[in-house]
Regions:
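Short, C-terminally biased terminal segments at protein or domain edges
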Residues: 1-55, 59-156
Length: 156
């Protein structure tokens, strides 16, 4: 079994990265006057997902990691709201909205599954919230299947 040694190995972080690229490409269609408005808001929330996954991974407790995953999940809700606004303002079409919204749902499911896994791991394996300071030690394949295989992302 494999041990994940960095956040870059997490399937959920990889998908958050792909999603960020998708959002950046989508917001290129937004009017220039939105650069400091909706465009900035949705891209900052999108970057926040991967950033919180990465930051949480390097914390020294599963409890902290879960806290950062919950923040990442909140950013997904923020993006969903922003997608509705972009649709209402006709910055994106219905197809782009549906496709991107579906990706937010998938990413949210992955994060929820990962939170559930970390909580169950803590209950089943340790009363001590501290984890190895060098790496988080958990079975990669178990977590991979619990949080779902990487979504079939289409970028571009």
């Amino acid at each position: 079994m494999s041990t994940i040694k960095s956040f870059e190995e997490l399937p959920v972080w990889k998908d958050a990265r792909k999603f960020a690229n998708k959002i950046y490409n989508l917001t290129k269609k937004f009017p220039k006057e939105e650069n400091y408005g909706l465009t900035s808001q949705i891209t900052r929330a999108t970057v926040s997902i991967g950033s919180n996954i990465a930051e949480g991974f390097d914390r020294y407790s599963k409890k902290d990691f879960i806290k950062y995953l919950i923040i990442a999940r909140g950013s997904i809700s923020e993006i969903q709201n922003d997608l509705y606004i972009a649709l209402d303002l006709k910055y994106i079409n219905q197809n782009d909205f549906q496709e991107t919204y579906a990706l937010t749902k998938e990413l949210g499911k992955q994060i929820n599954g990962f939170i559930k896994y970390l909580r169950s791991y803590d209950k089943n394996n340790s009363k001590d919230d501290k984890v190895n300071e060098e790496y988080y030690k958990y079975d990669f394949w178990t977590s991979y299947f619990l949080i779902g295989k990487s979504a079939n992302w289409r970028i571009g």
